[in-house]
């Protein structure tokens, strides 16, 4: 009985040896993403006017089960509007470490301003860089966040480190950390 089971196992191994490998040599090769893939959040603009679609209603923040979104609304100036309507998102922040990419914010948005895109490379060196602000997410800003940062830091040495205290955020002190 033991010899038969060993022969079956060896046969299975030999059969798998000649099959095409499933792995992808990332980053040289890119895997094709599924149409329903949920990646980095994007805030969109109206195509004709260029105004932001976000009206600062905070429905995305209310729908977020991970409490990753913070929205602070501001009154729109009628002479220089930021978005159509009376209000706009003065502050829009999303903590990508808390986000679970469920898409509830996208579904809750009444104007279609929040869209989960296809970008999935969001690693960074510092905690504060993982909290995306409105300027990091608006479509129409040249290049991605990482490309703009790399262009600004071209030729500068990069210092990589870690926090000894674990990097826990203190609610009373806010999100600013010493470098």
UniProtKB/Swiss-Prot annotation:
GO cellular component, as recorded: plasma membrane
| Membrane topology field | Peripheral membrane protein
| Broad class of where this protein is predominantly found | membrane
Binding locations of [4Fe-4S] cluster 1: 54, 57, 60, 109
**Can you provide one Gene Ontology molecular function annotated for this UniProt record?**
iron ion binding
**GO:BP terms for this protein?**
aerobic respiration
Which residues are in coiled coils? Answer: none
> Where on the tree of life does the source sit, at the highest rank?
Bacteria
- Subcellular location, record wording: Cell membrane
Q: Which UniProt keywords apply?
A: 4Fe-4S, Cell membrane, Iron, Iron-sulfur, Membrane, Metal-binding, NAD, Quinone, Repeat, Translocase, Ubiquinone
Give the main EC class: translocase
Question: Its quaternary structure?
Answer: NDH-1 is composed of 15 different subunits. Subunits NuoA, H, J, K, L, M, N constitute the membrane sector of the complex.
What protein name does the entry list? NADH-quinone oxidoreductase subunit I
Taxonomic lineage: Bacteria, Thermotogati, Deinococcota, Deinococci, Deinococcales
């Amino acid at each position: 009985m033991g010899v038969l089971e060993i022969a079956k196992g060896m046969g299975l191994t030999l059969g798998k040896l000649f099959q095409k490998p499933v792995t992808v040599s990332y980053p040289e090769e890119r895997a094709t993403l599924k149409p329903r893939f949920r990646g980095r959040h994007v805030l969109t603009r109206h195509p004709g006017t260029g105004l932001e679609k976000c009206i600062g209603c905070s429905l995305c923040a209310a729908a977020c089960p991970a409490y990753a979104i913070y929205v602070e609304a501001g009154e729109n100036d009628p002479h220089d509007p930021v978005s159509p309507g009376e209000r706009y998102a003065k502050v829009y922040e999303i903590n990508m470490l808390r986000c679970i990419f469920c898409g509830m914010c996208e579904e809750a948005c009444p104007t279609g301003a929040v869209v989960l895109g296809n970008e999935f490379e969001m690693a960074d060196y510092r905690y504060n860089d993982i909290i995306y602000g409105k300027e990091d997410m608006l479509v129409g800003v040249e290049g991605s966040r990482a490309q703009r940062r790399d262009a600004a830091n071209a030729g500068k040495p990069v210092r990589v480190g870690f926090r000894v205290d674990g990097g826990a955020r203190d609610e009373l002190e806010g999100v600013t950390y010493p470098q």
